[in-house]
Amino acid sequence: MLGRNTWKTSAFSFLVEQMWAPLWSRSMRPGRWCSQRSCAWQTSNNTLHPLWTVPVSVPGGTRQSPINIQWRDSVYDPQLKPLRVSYEAASCLYIWNTGYLFQVEFDDATEASGISGGPLENHYRLKQFHFHWGAVNEGGSEHTVDGHAYPAELHLVHWNSVKYQNYKEAVVGENGLAVIGVFLKLGAHHQTLQRLVDILPEIKHKDARAAMRPFDPSTLLPTCWDYWTYAGSLTTPPLTESVTWIIQKEPVEVAPSQLSAFRTLLFSALGEEEKMMVNNYRPLQPLMNRKVWASFQATNEGTRS
């Protein structure tokens, strides 16, 4: 599917292993590329990861992610509750290079770290968080706002511990996952992010892993808790439509040097031809008949930070 053996043994193998090979037994069919002007830069960039050089979606999929969020078209819902976030720093386990991105894993055996409230009816346990980024600062986020792509995007992935026994079940279950998305923009140095940046040289190659001291990921969240929410999917195979997305309106600032450090990682394993870990985002998907709900009312001010 990906063409070169080096890609098959790196990013693609990771995706299959992480998302459970049995799910790939479902037939996959080409999906249409996003036709919106908003994704022109992202999809015209010819250095997309090979996983996305051929459009892929799930058969009959109607709620694929990521999407372009039209600020003015989002619908204010006064019944949306504040999101409650409670993360236990000690539940942080390790950081590793998956072959597609770098990921920080958490102990999800208890309710110690998780979220509730917002658009969610149940408690969701934190499983992991990771980032997506581009080769250049003009794009790299998976979601966009009014056609604007940010340099990177943080995803905190949670699973419904009330309805399901474990993460694997939740991935394929209704209302199984909740993902908080946070945009990164260039600006001031981010002190907490630097803790991750300092470890990246230890996980340069695929499958490399490093221990983590206690880490509270709430320190990576913006100070403003306004958000958009919509029904979507995973943005990596198996692309299951089990995700409630919670996209924070306010981006967080990171220094250019910190984002550049992300680009020092490799898709490839030690001994393989080196492939820079950049452009690890999925192209935009059509909104179709979905609505994007907002926890805040639109104003006459600028549409983005």
Swiss-Prot record:
Name its cellular compartments.
Mitochondrion
**Entry-linked SUPFAM superfamilies:** Carbonic anhydrase
Q: Name one GO molecular function term.
A: carbonate dehydratase activity
Q: Could you list the residue ranges forming a coiled coil in this record?
A: none
Task: List the record's Gene Ontology CC terms alphabetically.
Answer: cytoplasm; mitochondrial matrix; mitochondrion
Q: Which cofactor does it need?
A: Zn(2+)
Q: Where is the transit peptide?
A: 1-38
Task: Spell out the reaction equation it catalyses.
Answer: hydrogencarbonate + H(+) = CO2 + H2O
Record-annotated Alpha-carbonic anhydrase domain positions: 39-296
Task: Show the InterPro entries listed in the entry.
Answer: CA_dom (IPR001148), CA_dom_sf (IPR036398), Carbonic_anhydrase_a-class (IPR023561), Carbonic_anhydrase_a-class_CS (IPR018338)
Ordered alphabetically, the record's keywords are: Disease variant, Lyase, Metal-binding, Mitochondrion, Transit peptide, Zinc
Control of this protein's activity is summarized as: Activated by L- and D-histidine. Activated by L- and D-phenylalanine. Activated by L-adrenaline. Inhibited by coumarins, sulfonamide derivatives such as acetazolamide and Foscarnet (phosphonoformate trisodium salt). Activated by histamine.
- What EC number(s) does its UniProt record assign? 4.2.1.1
In this chain, Zn(2+) is annotated as bound at H130, H132, H155
Task: Quote any Pfam family the record assigns.
Answer: Carb_anhydrase
Location, primary (coarse class): mitochondrion
Function description: Mitochondrial carbonic anhydrase that catalyzes the reversible conversion of carbon dioxide to bicarbonate/HCO3. Mitochondria are impermeable to HCO3, and thus this intramitochondrial carbonic anhydrase is pivotal in providing HCO3 for multiple mitochondrial enzymes that catalyze the formation of essential metabolites of intermediary metabolism in the urea and Krebs cycles.
Q: Which family does it belong to?
A: Belongs to the alpha-carbonic anhydrase family.
UniProt disease annotation: Hyperammonemia due to carbonic anhydrase VA deficiency: An autosomal recessive inborn error of metabolism, clinically characterized by infantile hyperammonemic encephalopathy. Metabolic abnormalities include hypoglycemia, hyperlactatemia, metabolic acidosis and respiratory alkalosis.
Which PANTHER family does the protein's record reference? CARBONIC ANHYDRASE, CARBONIC ANHYDRASE 5A, MITOCHONDRIAL
This one is known as Carbonic anhydrase 5A, mitochondrial
Native species of this protein? Homo sapiens (Human)
